[in-house]
Amino acid sequence: LCDLCSMIKCPFVPPHPWNLDFPHTMMRATAITFRKGEVKGGAKFLASTDVNGQFAGIPIVVQVVNAVNRTRTARKLMDSQLGVHPDAWLPELASQRFRWSAPRAASRVVTNGERTPGKVAIFSTCYVNYNEPGIGFDLLKLLDHNAIPYVIVEKEKCCGMPKLELGDLETVEKHKTANIAALAP
């Protein structure tokens, strides 16, 4: 995650006496590697969170996928084919997707705050939607408790972070464009 290190501690970012920008240099290197076709299929598969997450919420399929992912044989296969270490923690697919099961917001008057517009657009993310919908439900409870109106963004794409880590900047751009359209109609 060299592209994120500049946010906390990387000393090799502008302004720098030698005009270094290490995080962006690393990002350019991964983009070049991706364009050359040197990224393995397993990494591409793992970065396709919207495709992989489609299994979440499908009765029986979720239980089968989660059970198989816990077997030693499957974990060894994932190691050899996808590069996922057999002992690495894997999030389970949720039995219900956040987007499918989240209640609509109660009708509330939007009251602008001192520093905020008084309403929230919820971009649920792949992880909340497919793996941990409880996080999203907790957020909705918090918003309801504080009488803050919300809307769950429809038709958003993955934020693109897994694709960014691969160097797949073209797909990141497509996701960004789709998400801007969904967030700012």
Spans of model-derived segments:
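Iron-sulfur-cluster electron-transfer modules
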Residues: 1-185
